[in-house]
Amino acid sequence: MRAVYILAMACAATLQASSSALPSTKDLNSQVESLVPSDITDSAHVGGVRLLRVEDKEEETEEERGFGGALADGLKKLNPAKAAKKAKEKSCEN
């Protein structure tokens, strides 16, 4: 029974804290209006065409992401057929 009360209090505290963290809609609208200057909106349209994104074609660099390159190189070195052949040659020498 105590667990139910503790859970209810935790939910109530979470909801109260999350609702007090949000600004009121009246304040939010005034902040949005003050943050949109006309020069930003005009710069999105050039020559009657809306610019969504600018790409730099000069530098096309490819990045290695994650462990893909190192993992592939390591897997190339791990060839079980070569390892078995080397082990067989080593055992024949002894």
Curated annotation (Swiss-Prot):
Tell me the classification of the organism that encodes this protein: Eukaryota, Sar, Stramenopiles, Oomycota, Peronosporales
One Pfam family cited in the UniProt record for this chain: RXLR
**Which species is the source of this protein?**
Phytophthora infestans (strain T30-4)
Biological function: Effector that enhances P.infestans colonization of Nicotiana benthamiana leaves.
- Could you tell me what this protein is called? RxLR effector protein PITG_15972
Describe how expression is induced or repressed: Expression is induced during host plant infection.
Family listed: Belongs to the RxLR effector family.
Assigned GO CC terms: extracellular region; host cell cytoplasm; host cell nucleus
Its domain of life reads Eukaryota
Q: Where is the signal peptide?
A: 1-21
Keywords, ordered alphabetically: Host cytoplasm, Host nucleus, Secreted, Signal, Virulence
What are the subcellular locations of this protein?
Secreted; Host cytoplasm; Host nucleus
**Sorted alphabetically, which InterPro entries does this protein's record hold?**
RXLR
Q: What is known of its domains?
A: The RxLR-dEER motif acts to carry the protein into the host cell cytoplasm through binding to cell surface phosphatidylinositol-3-phosphate.
Motif RxLR-dEER located where?
50-65
